[in-house]
């Protein structure tokens, strides 16, 4: 069994499935190590509401749930949750293990 094939549900890793949104940015397709102009989706940088663990979740969507400008202008915390979110373990070029997260969709929560 390969560790990279494991899918870890987000709910199994974090007590609370609601996260504080800190940033939104697009992510693009790469071909042969080169970034293309083909938009694959948006990356949501979040912080866990309990122990303040920081991580990002990629969502394959051509439209973000909130723009970076709207997030920046907000005077209060913005909370999000993710549908069918999971993490995958991968090894970096220097040999350390990391987890990348992705989800089917993201949803804004009422404050």
Model segments located where?
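OB-fold and OB-like single-stranded nucleic-acid-recognition modules
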Residues: 1-111
